[in-house]
Amino acid sequence: MRRIAVMGAAGRMGKTLVEAVQQRSPASGLTAAIVRPGSTLIGADAGELASLGRIGVSLSGNLEQVADEFDVLIDFTLPDVMLKNLAFCRKAGKAMVIGTTGLTLEQKQLLAEAGKDIPIVFAANFSVGVNLSLKLLDLAARVLGDEADIEIIETHHRHKIDAPSGTALRMGEAIADALGRDLSKVAVYGREGHTGARARDTIGFATVRGGDVVGDHTVLFASEGERLEITHKASSRMTFAKGAVRAALWLEGRAAGLYDMRDVLDLH
């Protein structure tokens, strides 16, 4: 059974990941939990911090110090932190599950390079429902795409720092790929003022931030006389955490490579 470590274990998503690991993989469970260096929480029990009771795993402020205690690292931290962890895991031969969003093209290329040496699952969203939605969007785009105007609307809590969301961008990529378009050339991010008529082949993005919304995504295919909406709404971060743990367990015995949740769920 895979020994799992969680990076950023003191954060909102990190604590949810700790809980998800304990629920899904109690036999081996969480074997390491890492927080930022200098944190006042170093030494605390990860289970107690996640309101689970003691699980015997103390928070560490140094990934290298716990290198012998895990096989796969789940990392949802910010890009700069994640890339440092990626470099370490690549050198140490550790698998990774990465849910970091807001990556640049160059940073994604670093993931691809690391995937030559270690197995990595990278996804903008680990929800089973979202990844099924990507499959549906591919189908809808192939059937309706040339006849419909396509808009992607996403809503998240006030604390989210990147926009559009990684999930919205992944949805846009799925649609653009199905239509043979380059998303970087057809994406329109928000509109203001006298924009003129809508260009036919564009894919629009609208972003809403407020409250404690975990994540809502709607893709609109609007044509003459009808419209199709494909919507996914997440009500709990546990949805993403369970998917990440599923990916971590799936990586056992996998060859080096850069995988995504479509591989984990066999949705290709």
Curated annotation (Swiss-Prot):
Membership in a protein family: Belongs to the DapB family.
Stated role: Catalyzes the conversion of 4-hydroxy-tetrahydrodipicolinate (HTPA) to tetrahydrodipicolinate.
Superkingdom per UniProt: Bacteria
Alphabetic keyword roster: Amino-acid biosynthesis, Cytoplasm, Diaminopimelate biosynthesis, Lysine biosynthesis, NAD, NADP, Oxidoreductase
Active site: H156 (proton donor/acceptor), K160 (proton donor)
This protein's GO CC annotations: cytosol
Catalytically driven reaction(s): (S)-2,3,4,5-tetrahydrodipicolinate + NAD(+) + H2O = (2S,4S)-4-hydroxy-2,3,4,5-tetrahydrodipicolinate + NADH + H(+); (S)-2,3,4,5-tetrahydrodipicolinate + NADP(+) + H2O = (2S,4S)-4-hydroxy-2,3,4,5-tetrahydrodipicolinate + NADPH + H(+)
Protein name according to UniProt: 4-hydroxy-tetrahydrodipicolinate reductase
GO MF annotation list: 4-hydroxy-tetrahydrodipicolinate reductase; NAD binding; NADP binding; oxidoreductase activity, acting on CH or CH2 groups, NAD or NADP as acceptor
